[in-house]
Design a protein with these regions (language model features):
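Active-site acidic Asp-centered loop
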Residues: 99-101
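Conserved alpha/beta core of the MobA/IspD/sugar-nucleotide pyrophosphorylase nucleotidyltransferase superfamily
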Residues: 159-225
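Short phosphate-binding loop-to-helix
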Residues: 67-97
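A short, N-terminal amphipathic alpha-helix
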Residues: 32-51
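Short, glycine-/small-residue-rich phosphate/pyrophosphate-handling segment
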Residues: 139-161
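Acidic donor-binding segment of Leloir-type glycosyltransferases
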Residues: 49-71
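Conserved donor-nucleotide/metal-binding helix-loop-beta segment in metal-dependent transferases, i.e.
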Residues: 106-132
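N-terminal nucleotide-binding beta1-loop-alpha1 segment
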Residues: 1-21
Length: 225
């Protein structure tokens, strides 16, 4: 019997991806950036030894993930949280990780670190984003979890876990700290050498994003992007 997936990557429709970047990047550029970070997340998951599943309704994403398990979104469900809660029923029952698809610096090591942060059952570990989101969550087990993604989701997930009697831990490894939603996020990525050398960083440099950031006054404290 095939093993059930234990890491879930939700992926929005590519034509709807990165809406907060639509005044900064063209649709084609936003799609390319999304695919770039998705490939980075998939690679990290596979190298860390997870059985990866993609949650999506996008045919192009399904084609891209042809060698992975695909859980198709259900039309009758509304919003990301309902889709994730439903998808968890099709996955492993003892331990699951949920990871955003837009983490440009994620590594296998950071996912293993997330896993090691939970040394007991009935626990949740949240990798917090710099703006208070939940970039990655380990659920051990997932049966007590209800997704609350959106603004401030890290605090919401943490508080819900405590209320449910679970052990809750928040970590902030640099590889899981940054997701790409806004021009400011692109600036944060391109302000570091490791960010510029990432696949997403290389693509952004290729399309002159640094010049665009400077023109839009997205500068760091050194006056550089």
């Amino acid at each position: 019997m095939a093993k059930q997936p234990n890491l879930l990557i939700p992926v929005n429709r590519l034509t709807k991806t990165k809406g907060r970047l639509q005044t900064f990047l063209s649709e084609e550029e936003r799609i390319h950036l999304t695919i770039s970070t998705l490939k980075t997340v998939i690679e990290a998951s596979n190298k860390a030894g997870f059985i990866t599943a993609i949650l999506t309704s996008d045919k192009d994403v399904i084609s891209l993930a042809s060698d992975l398990i695909v859980i198709q979104e259900k039309q009758e469900l509304k919003g990301l949280n309902e889709q994730i809660n439903s998808a968890l029923n099709e996955m492993a029952k003892d331990e699951i990780v949920i990871v955003h698809a837009d983490l440009p610096l994620i590594t296998a090591k950071s996912l293993i670190q997330l896993k090691k942060a939970s040394l007991q059952t009935n626990s949740i570990v949240i990798a917090k984003s710099f703006d208070g989101g939940s970039n990655a969550i380990l659920l051990k087990p997932p049966k007590y979890f209800s997704a609350e993604y959106g603004p401030g989701s890290c605090a919401k997930h943490h508080n819900s876990a405590i209320t449910a009697g679970l052990s809750a831990t928040v970590i902030d490894p640099p590889e899981l700290y940054l997701d790409l939603d806004t021009p400011k996020d692109l600036q944060k990525l391109l302000a570091t050498e490791i960010g510029r050398k990432s696949p997403a960083g290389k693509y952004l440099i290729k399309i002159d994003a640094i010049k665009r950031l400077k023109e839009a006054n997205f500068l760091d404290v050194r006056g550089e992007v």
